[in-house]
Amino acid sequence: MTLPIHFPRCVLYGMASAVWSILFLHILVGDTMSAADALSWSGGLIHSPAHRVNVMRSHHHEMGKELEQQHGGEEQQMQRDTKPAAFSNPPHLATGRGPSFVHADGQLDVSCFPHDKNIGSRTTEVAVVQVSSVQDCMKQCQSRPTCSHFTYNKNSKKCHLKDGAPVFYTYTGDMTGPRSCEHTCTDNCWMHSGNPLGTFQYSGHAPAFCWAACKGTAGCVMYTFQGGVCKLYSKNSVERA
């Protein structure tokens, strides 16, 4: 004959309290903590306080890993969204490394100088090469550290690479361009004092030619371009505006 088991009322209250604690923890932390973990944590009936601490540490560690992975994914997406679409390979023109501005179709930007005005340059040549286009001539200039500008003749397909300040003149079929069309300085960029290293009249030409003149002049670190007048200065004769 089996006798019924009777628990003291205090024991029944304790068991009910433990069950409610388990349910409360599971609802509070949602899916991030399983019912088994909640039971282990609240397990005053089963585990020690030290075990409960370890369970909570493990739970927080897993949550931290999830947040870190989420943040890393957002950062990578931001980098993809902000990547330039129109240009690539930022140039390092002062040292002769890298390309000029490149269009999305892979062609160099040669829009800063006229192609049909028969404009040549008398500046000393460092080399003459045979190429098929004005873009190829610009590439040849950029491949040589001392090249400041070039003259391309569309009839002869000859590319004349120059290493000094442009000295313009008229010659049939010629087009003269700077090392890069990137340099688009506006007027009043810099203030100056003292005497300039050189002064050039570049009225009607792009400011990039003033940059080319500075690159081709020893000691030049800065230039001004105002009203078509290009002035070159050394580091001892310029100060930031």
UniProtKB/Swiss-Prot annotation:
Gene3D superfamilies per the UniProt record, alphabetical: 3.30.30.180, Hepatocyte Growth Factor
InterPro entries, A to Z: Apple, Pan_app
Keyword NADP recorded: no
One Pfam family recorded for the sequence: PAN_4
Residues making up the propeptide: 35-103
Residues that, per the record, bind a carbohydrate: 121, 162, 169, 174
Function: Galactose-binding lectin. Plays a role in adhesion to the host cell. Has a potential role in invasion of host cells.
Protein name: Major microneme antigen
Origin species: Sarcocystis muris
